[in-house]
């Protein structure tokens, strides 16, 4: 009896000590306690579930009627606002997941996507004193010993960190990225909480299948929380694309960096979707779209090292002193590392889509994990275009606002099947789908979706990737076989140039068409 009482007191004491230590390390902020965050999340999940049960699932609907569609849209909006409130209170990892949802424009109901998009630019910020504390803890010195000046207003605030402009004692202007002090300590319990919430919602709503999102977040979060890894990624991608004089990646100041503090070169520019900035500086929006398309096509189909967070705040455009266009690529915390096999299969999938070859689409979709007739939906998710357009030929049908609205409105009708695709597909594909959607969003804002150059550059990269893998497989077959594959590759590229020159002539005239393929 005495032993049981002692053990009981010990457990309670350990719990209180753990809570006390958590409060102490987070400046006595009760929001840092796992039980507080868990309770808040549980209450929000129950609230959302009851909202659907009360507002939508209380009766049998004819799901084809306008009344049902309007009511479902209204309830989606209410639920999304409730989740946004939870995200903004719990911050940190929750904001990261919310941003991910806000990027999946063609994969989730538009009410959730539009509601979460605010998190890309308006994430909650921390007082400067909290950031100074992180700098002192990690760099073992006061900020005044490193910086001549440190602007109190952040340049930007994201889910895991915020960035401030500063000047080093040595005179260089730098951008200082400091991790929010509460993020790392709360990350483990937050991911467990989200996993639990998703499991509960999946039991209530069988069509609610976003386990893939939690799995990806659990895998990627520790990587993103290590700013030294981000610095290494920045240097790697700068080296890979040094041939492009128009691409700038900020230099890293390793002497002043740690796992929670990253000091890098300060580079000015306007957000890639800031149309006023682009007009004021006489920047060609088509040239911007072409270079971003070229960069990401090479990343996905050639190098396999893909910057996976290209939202507008992470891509700047500017004019150099020589008056040429420059793209500045920021935030290198999350990269997809694609295997050679994945790049080969994905390249062949795109080539089959561009050739409107249904049999090959099914075959290469299966190589990427998609079973049966879901290959058609998968092709729509990859391209961001309706099936009718895919079958007519992407290069023959111009993208329109009506098409975008149709696609978004139909998303909710096929949401269970979209969930099936995301559960089945090769995990490497998840970051690529997110990246594709973000790039399409940039093109939409720049109004450059109908430019043939994007397809031309991507088609070239697909052909080169496909033949490179074929040559690698035939490395023991002798030089004649390798030579034949090179000849076939050259022939395919020649046909592509002729085809896109022809499309350019039809759409833009001779001179403009010639510029696109030179």
Swiss-Prot record:
A single GO cellular-component term from the record reads: mitochondrial inner membrane
Any signal peptide, and if so, which residues? none
Give all residue intervals belonging to the Protein kinase domain: 149-468
> Where, by residue number, is the active site?
309 (proton acceptor)
Identify the main location: mitochondrion
Enzyme Commission code: 2.7.-.-
Q: Which compartments is it annotated to reside in? A: Mitochondrion
Gene ablation phenotype (knockout):
RNAi-mediated knockdown is larval lethal. RNAi-mediated knockdown in adults results in the thoracic muscles displaying abnormally orientated fibers as well as an abnormal increase in mitochondrial fusion resulting in mitochondrial dysfunction in ATP production, ROS generation and cell apoptosis. Consequently, adults display a held-up wing phenotype, are unable to fly and also display defects in locomotion. RNAi-mediated knockdown in salivary glands also results in an increase in mitochondrial fusion.
Cite the entry's keywords alphabetically.
ATP-binding, Kinase, Mitochondrion, Nucleotide-binding, Transferase, Transit peptide
GO terms in the biological process aspect are: lipid homeostasis; mitochondrion organization; negative regulation of mitochondrial fusion; positive regulation of cristae formation
Look at the named UniProt entry and state the broad enzyme category this protein falls under.
transferase
Looking up Pfam families in the UniProt record yields: ABC1
Query: What's one GO MF term for it?
Result: protein kinase activity
Q: Which CDD domains does the entry mention? A: ADCK1-like (cd13969)
Source domain of life: Eukaryota
For the keyword Repeat, the answer is: no
Q: Could you tell me which SMART domains the record lists for this protein?
A: S_TKc
**Where do the annotations place ATP binding?**
155-163, 177
- Keyword Kinase attributed: yes
Q: What family is it from?
A: Belongs to the protein kinase superfamily. ADCK protein kinase family.
Q: What does this protein do?
A: Essential for maintaining mitochondrial cristae formation and mitochondrial function by acting via YME1L to regulate the mitochondrial structural proteins Opa1 and Mitofilin. This function is likely to be kinase-independent. Functions in tracheal development and larval molting probably by acting in sterol modification and/or intracellular lipid trafficking. The action of this enzyme is not yet clear. It is not known if it has protein kinase activity and what type of substrate it would phosphorylate (Ser, Thr or Tyr).
Protein name listed in UniProt: AarF domain-containing kinase 1
Q: Which organism is it from?
A: Drosophila melanogaster
What's the encoding gene here? Adck1
